[in-house]
Amino acid sequence: MNSGFVTLVGRPNAGKSSLINSFIGRKVLIVSEKPQTTRNKIRCIYTDSYHQIIFTDTPGIHKPVHRLGEFMVKVAIQAMKGVDLVLFVVDATKGFGEPEKRICDLVKLSKTETFLVINKIDLAKNYEFLAKTIVSECDCFSKVFFTSVVKNEGIEELLQAIKNCMPEGPMYFPENMLIDRPISFQIAEIIREKVLLFTREEIPHCVAVIVDTMEKRQNNLLYVAATIYVERNSQKGIIIGKNGNMLKQIGTLSRIEIESIVGSKVYLDLHVKVKKNWRDKDFIILNEIGMKDEIE
């Protein structure tokens, strides 16, 4: 068997999570058009008869304005260490800017084999010129690929090239395991994804979701109590909505998706609470939203 570790890096909203979902063949990571959707380092496992590839999704590398952002960037940088391959994912519609220049420097420092992946080519025309520009600025790529998750272009070719790079090794995870996070983390992420779907402006960035309780009840019902944290009372009002309608929408869509992954009926009990300026409080970031193990 050939097995190994692959880290995806890029600016926020470059499509890293969508690429991993395409590799795995099903949705294992939340996706959103909102930047900085991914906050944690998340490992997703692809397994076939001859390969096991552990893909690490990372927060987008950006210029942070809160302590949360600082930790997210630190997580992304550390995820490039000790892996077999790095995929530098570039949004074809954004071009080669300061985030890409910074990531190029980090890629060079990692001294790890790196593929350049120009993603979202269905939305841009000059993506081949963009690739040439990046290669001329950062001559550290062993291969260049052009992909579109929406049109399923270049995905299989990229996956095959990744397989070819994997060294001989053991099966690190059970063959039916798709993600290295507990079900409570996955549920919290699903709820946060629905908040991102229904809200705009500053709300997506100030939301954290914590699963407080999970317990099996009669008739195989899974009871889940979760809290959506925001920073201000005005944000709390937006998420609850008029007559509670926004929270009901978030809860309904979340429950349907949670039921699909746990295989049973779910009672989802959602609450919204205010934790002022939580994005600048280290204890909350490290312990309550689970970044402590990722940066040590």
From Swiss-Prot:
Family matches, as Gene3D superfamilies: 3.30.300.20, P-loop containing nucleotide triphosphate hydrolases
Membrane topology: Peripheral membrane protein
Function in brief: An essential GTPase that binds both GDP and GTP, with rapid nucleotide exchange. Plays a role in 16S rRNA processing and 30S ribosomal subunit biogenesis and possibly also in cell cycle regulation and energy metabolism.
Protein name per the record: GTPase Era
Family: Belongs to the TRAFAC class TrmE-Era-EngA-EngB-Septin-like GTPase superfamily. Era GTPase family.
Main subcellular location: cytoplasm
Species, as recorded: Pseudothermotoga lettingae (strain ATCC BAA-301 / DSM 14385 / NBRC 107922 / TMO)
Keywords for this protein: Cell inner membrane, Cell membrane, Cytoplasm, GTP-binding, Membrane, Nucleotide-binding, Ribosome biogenesis, RNA-binding, rRNA-binding
Region (G5): 147-149
Residue segments, region G3: 57-60
Assembly notes: Monomer.
Cellular localization per UniProt: Cytoplasm; Cell inner membrane
GO cellular component terms given for this protein: cytosol; plasma membrane
UniProt GO molecular function: GTP binding; GTPase activity; ribosomal small subunit binding; small ribosomal subunit rRNA binding
Domain of life: Bacteria
Cysteine disulfide partners in this protein: none
Domain KH type-2: 199-276
InterPro entries assigned: G_ERA_dom, GTP-bd, GTPase_Era-like, KH_dom-like_a/b, KH_dom_type_2, KH_sf_prok-type, P-loop_NTPase, Small_GTP-bd
Transmembrane segments: none
Keyword Cytoplasm in annotation: yes
All residue ranges annotated as the Era-type G domain in the record: 2-168
NCBIfam families: era (TIGR00436), PRK00089.1 (NF000908), small_GTP (TIGR00231)
Gene: era
